[in-house]
Amino acid sequence: VLDGERGICLDLSALEPVQGVENKIFHFDGRTLTPVEIRADGYYKLVPTESLPTLEINGVKMHRSKDIDPGEDARAKTALVVRPGDIVLDTCGGLGYSAVFAVKAGAVRVISTE
């Protein structure tokens, strides 16, 4: 596994502790792999999909990921409502997919809040 910015190489033996772990994304700090998750007022974790990850809170996915990837879902939804020149209020901003696709659809400003 390479870190493109610094060219760090991860020895494959470092992956042994996470071998077989499914539905989690890990962060590598240069020495160890740690699940990207939070355990405060609930359980939050990033879950991999075929493309962009989805956020899961207490077992509930925050993005559609069955038969569509979260990015394509956000693109399709924003294409229905955002027009060039729009100012968009994105509530429940989450991972920012809707905000990104609102800009790509021509929004001149996106105000995003969680």
Tell me what each language-model feature is.
Residues 1-49:
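N-terminal auxiliary segments of SAM/dcSAM-dependent transferases
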Residues 109-114:
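Conserved SAM-binding motif I beta-strand of class I
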Residues 52-83:
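SAM-dependent Rossmann-like transferase core, predominantly class I methyltransferases
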